[in-house]
A protein has these predicted regions:
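N-terminal membrane-targeting hydrophobic helices
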Residues: 1-169
Length: 169
């Protein structure tokens, strides 16, 4: 999942408006960024970034840091869930490690790009509706608000086109 991670951050923002979106988006993408850093160092290992164990540890770390900084338990739980949402979201679209030495599992919808796009678009739209409900009434119906789901869906199309030649055909 690509744009869906950002959408899940907007879902968390909609549920917990006090938590900054500028924190939630990086938290939602954290396993990918950890993977890219290790890949750049020539030490790529998806168990370090994407296993259930590493996702649980990363989610716990960022949630504890947020709790220490804010003393807001429910908001810290939202931060934890945002990080942890990465694994089930990626389970839908790809293949993910469970634990070191454990099986790799997933629905691997990347092999079916149109279906993957449809699932991701649904995630984006549902998350946007939750986020939109958190806005002041006057702001909910502004056209500019549509830029969030449109932009995320456009990002997903670009991602699929760049990574899957059959999607372009």
């Amino acid at each position: 999942m690509y744009a869906g991670h950002a959408a899940l951050a907007t879902l968390a923002k909609g549920a917990r408006p006090r938590v900054p979106i500028g924190l939630l988006v990086p938290v939602a993408f954290a396993p990918d960024w950890i993977q890219w850093v290790f890949d750049a160092m020539g030490r790529g290992n998806r168990e370090i970034s994407h296993s259930l164990v590493s996702v649980a540890m990363g989610a716990t770390l960022v949630a504890l840091l947020y709790l220490l900084a804010t003393r807001q338990r429910v908001d810290a739980a939202a931060v934890w869930l945002t990080y942890a949402s990465h694994w089930p979201a990626d389970y839908i679209t790809g293949l993910k490690p469970t634990w070191p030495g454990g099986p790799t599992v997933g629905l691997h919808l990347y092999t079916r790009p149109f279906l993957e796009f449809c699932v991701e678009a649904i995630v984006i739209i549902v998350c946007w509706f939750v986020y939109r409900r958190s806005l002041p009434v006057a702001a909910r119906h502004r056209t500019v608000g549509l830029l969030i789901p449109i932009g995320l869906i456009a990002m997903q199309i670009a991602f699929l086109a760049a990574t899957n030649p059959s999607f372009r055909n």
